[in-house]
Amino acid sequence: KGKIFDPQMGKIDLKNNNVKFIGDPQKRIEEDYLRIIRFIRFKILYNSNVEYTTSQAIRHNLNGIKNISKERILVELFKILDLKNFIDLNDSEHLKELFSLIFPEFGNLKRLERLRKIFNHSQIKRDILLAVLLIDEKNNHEYFAHKYNISNDIKENLNLLSNDLKLIRENKDFFDKDLEKNIYLSNKNH
């Protein structure tokens, strides 16, 4: 067996679920502002603690995210949404606040709590998760789709779900009427 050279004591950090930048967090973030979003992803993935210096460096550099291409941001966002424990974002007010500052379109993070039981048993598809977090009366999903130039498939799914939600809100008897129609058609076919 070879020896592990660990000058940054990373092995200890892994044992203690600490995710942090190597060296000066300020310098690491300034080298690539996408590291802020990656930090959030790893923080959720490993359910780790946030050091004060890291927290301050992130807050100080949030504006740097504007300099990153939307495509790179979207790739990292999708990696975050695909985490099995994404819902744990709500367990940390600090992390939720950072996420909301970077992605203000996701104004419905409270809805994640309703999905906790589903998350415990299976992974929720990304499109559905986007719909839950984005769709509201303000058409946030349309702004998000435009801002990040998402695929047409995701746009269509979000628009379809948004339109269905509008129909449900406008017509309180939506399900009853649909049920009656389906029962009628089912009886007619037999």
Indicate where each model-derived feature is located.
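Glycine- and charge-enriched loop/helix tracts that form the active or gating conduit
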Residues: K1-H146
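Divalent metal-dependent catalytic cores for phosphoryl transfer on phosphate-bearing substrates
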Residues: E113-H190
